[in-house]
Amino acid sequence: QLTLRGSFYPSGKGYYAEHSDLNGGELILDIIPLSIVKEDYESGGLAIRSKQNKLINIEHKMRHGSVCYLKNSVNHKIQLIDKKKRFNKNLHIGRFSLISTTPKKINS
């Protein structure tokens, strides 16, 4: 079964360390942005590790309606959202997205 969850990375505080999803039971991860860099927050966001071992931020490529598909073996992270801004728990500013996963084995 597909799993759907929302994520929020607040401005000035939100990030997620680099990882792959090889051991998580997912085959494919798809990420649907609900906020857009330079519109809803200034910097940071989704970055992937290339085959040449280079970290590439792909957030600026995404628009409303985009879907980013990642194989479970691709290393990725969320770079700190708005690292030059101070975190304010009363503001809901930052990076929002929906994430769904396709399991490696689908029971029928």
Sequence positions of predicted segments:
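Conserved double-stranded beta-helix
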Residues: Q1-E39
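Catalytic core of Fe(II)/2-oxoglutarate
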Residues: V37, Y41-S108
